[in-house]
Design a protein with these regions (language model features):
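Conserved N-terminal subdomain of the carbohydrate kinase-like
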Residues: 2-9, 29-112, 116, 263-266
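Charged C-terminal helix
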Residues: 4, 55, 230-270
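Short pre-catalytic strand/loop immediately N-terminal to key active-site residues, enriched for Gly-Thr
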Residues: 10-16, 195-209
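N-terminal basic/disordered segments at the start of proteins
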Residues: 17-33
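Short, small-residue alpha-helix embedded
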Residues: 22-27, 146, 205-229
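Phosphate-handling active-site elements
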Residues: 31-36, 196, 222-236
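Conserved phosphate/ATP/ADP-binding segment of small-molecule kinases
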Residues: 120-195
Length: 270
């Protein structure tokens, strides 16, 4: 079967395979598309935490993006872990050259175990220069709080933060509501003309490592295959929920989810 689309993933490597580039590639491949990568950092981690982070030289990140895209033009780009301002600058420069229209930004800032994955200067550049280049921004609540400099304690706070991100130049926003203490998980989708709350069951499991990476990659894949942005978000959320429910229970900490749930893959393409 020929891949449905070509996706360039710009993100960090997770040695445990649950998040980062590894989760991104599993997601893209399971949904029938072709994944390419530009690695921004190499992390040594497992389900219990992050041991170390080794950054990739910004020039090499730039080279990965440009050299890959010159040969195989991506239909869409997913951006994940960007740990420094120099890395973000190199990515912005490369995006201005390759001119891909569909860009999903998952502003990864903190690992599931609590380790910080980005410095303060990088946050400012991401906020001021990268958000406006993205088709969709997909922060969780802690990330949305950092980006908007507001405290989020309720659904109403999430909606307010989403509007703040639009004011910062975001075209579309999906704030993930998993960190709120509520019976259901409510994810807020917003742009200048549309609004939607996606409601999902809350799953009683600690095995949720890589859910954010997986969601943004799934949305990128659906968007690259021609789905409208709101529908791509809906399908991505369904894919992640199915992957959580069928998680393989690996590791002693926050275990990975299951990217190979073929039943859900068949459902979302109906």
């Amino acid at each position: 079967m020929k891949p449905k689309s070509k996706i360039l993933i710009i993100a960090g490597s997770d040695s445990s395979g649950g998040a980062g580039i590894q989760a991104d590639l599993k997601t893209v491949t399971s949904l029938g598309s072709y994944g390419m990568t530009a690695i921004t950092a190499v992390t040594s981690q497992n389900t219990r935490g992050v041991k170390s982070i080794v950054p990739i030289d910004p020039k090499e990140i730039f080279n990965q993006i440009i050299f890959t895209s010159k040969d195989i033009k991506p239909d869409a780009i997913k951006i994940g872990m960007l740990h420094s301002s120099e890395v973000i600058k190199s990515i912005i420069s490369s995006l201005d050259i390759i001119k891909v229209r569909k860009i999903i930004l998952d502003p990864v800032m903190v690992a599931k175990g609590g380790a910080k994955l980005i410095d303060k200067k990088a946050i400012n550049i991401l906020r001021e220069k990268l958000i406006k280049r993205a088709t969709l921004v997909t922060p969780n609540i802690p990330e949305a709080e950092i980006l908007t400099k507001t405290k989020i304690m309720s659904k109403e706070d999430m909606i307010f933060a989403a509007h703040r991100l639009i004011d910062l130049g975001a075209k579309n926003v999906l704030i993930k509501g998993g960190h709120l203490k509520s019976k259901k998980v409510e994810d807020i989708f917003l742009n200048k003309s549309d609004f939607k709350i996606f409601i999902s069951s809350r799953h009683s499991t600690k095995n949720t490592h890589g859910t954010g990476c997986t969601l943004s990659s799934a949305i990128t894949t659906f968007l690259s295959c021609g789905k409208p942005i709101k529908k791509a978000c809906e399908l991505g959320i369904k894919y992640v929920n199915s992957a959580i429910l069928s998680n393989p229970k690996y590791g002693k900490g926050h275990g990975p989810i299951n990217h190979l749930n073929s039943m859900e893959i068949k459902k979302v393409f109906k």
